[in-house]
């Protein structure tokens, strides 16, 4: 009986093991199947070169020789406070002074000092170099140091302030290593990029890498700049990298490193480059003509803010406001007037002043385009023949400032005060004091009792709510009418130096 029980237990155990074995076998098959499926999903080949998986060395090695350091020479008087002290020269000077031999410090030889400016890159074996305009702006002498430490003088072939690009030329007996532009339109957010340059002026040939963080960035680095499609990267870019190249993994230049965003002045992972597709045509025009000609409308413009729109009785901020029309310019000849709102240019909707400047710059010179404006809340279409900006440059009214600082207050003049701002009638005394031409009419700001204001003493107000004004009583009337109508502000057209701009005055 005992033996029978043992046999039964053995059979049960064997059966259990068989079942477990089958389950384990099935589980293993499922796991294997799932593993195979998982492996297949993740075994798709990545579109990255084998070399770049582990190192960029093979990519950057042939590129570094084409990247240059740019510097200039300043002459420092050896006796100036900022000059480095030469102990031997000081001893000689002390000896001469003891002998009562006068020293003419102005005749002491000046010591040449190399001042780093930025980076650049060679685009042709004959020595053509691309860099940023701001790197070489206001510099008389430009020096180039190659990767092998050879130093050569460079001459400026041409520059374009509106895109911050410049073309230099060095002469060399031997063909120079060079790099080529690629297609920045093919670049995608997340692509690897490599920056090579001369950070802080003394670290030439520095290579950094990162990815494209974004494309089409519109940043306000300069009011004149019309580039509105910067490439953003987290590759380390610092002071001194300006003008250097941004490469893709195909060793092509897809950007010109131009700016960084940093409250500290050093890299925090936000850098910007001019796309190669923007730079290439500019460089070609600089090679050919040494300059870039663009379209000109001949008007001063400013953005429409909510306060300005409210002052004009508009319900939105579509378009840009014409603050001044240049006499005999294309806009003047076509009939554009101060106070008009440009809403379309060549069938392209106008969003803001920078967009309009870009559109005008790209407009065909000496050809007619259609411009749609809003005047007295009615749409009009005007044909305008665009001219070259080499004749005169169009600027945003907010770019210019009153160069003449006036701090004294005006007293004993018929005046009224609104919002801590004193307005006075334009007397002959005020004309002379604030240098206002005889043919100008309006009222003038004589005092401001607040620290921050969009107005300045000496501003001439010629228009309020698009109505001409020549007496402060009109200001009082329009201000009180707006107050009764529960309007937030009235709109003043001011003249400041050679510029015009609309500025809202809050109704309180």
Swiss-Prot record:
GO molecular function: serine-type endopeptidase activity
Active site: 134 (charge relay system), 164 (charge relay system), 242 (charge relay system)
Cellular component aspect of the GO annotation: outer membrane-bounded periplasmic space
EC number(s) on file: 3.4.21.107
InterPro entries noted in UniProt: PDZ, PDZ_sf, Pept_S1C_Do, Peptidase_S1_PA, Peptidase_S1C
Keyword terms of this UniProt record: Hydrolase, Periplasm, Protease, Repeat, Serine protease, Signal, Stress response
Catalytic activity: Acts on substrates that are at least partially unfolded. The cleavage site P1 residue is normally between a pair of hydrophobic residues, such as Val-|-Val
GO biological process annotation, one example: proteolysis
Signal peptide: 1-23
Broad class of enzyme this protein falls into: hydrolase
Pfam families the record matches: PDZ_2, Trypsin_2
Superkingdom of source: Bacteria
Region entry Serine protease, spans: 119-284
Xref: NCBIfam families: degP_htrA_DO
Name the UniProt record assigns to this protein: Probable periplasmic serine endoprotease DegP-like
Native species: Rickettsia conorii (strain ATCC VR-613 / Malish 7)
Organism taxonomic ancestry: Bacteria, Pseudomonadati, Pseudomonadota, Alphaproteobacteria, Rickettsiales
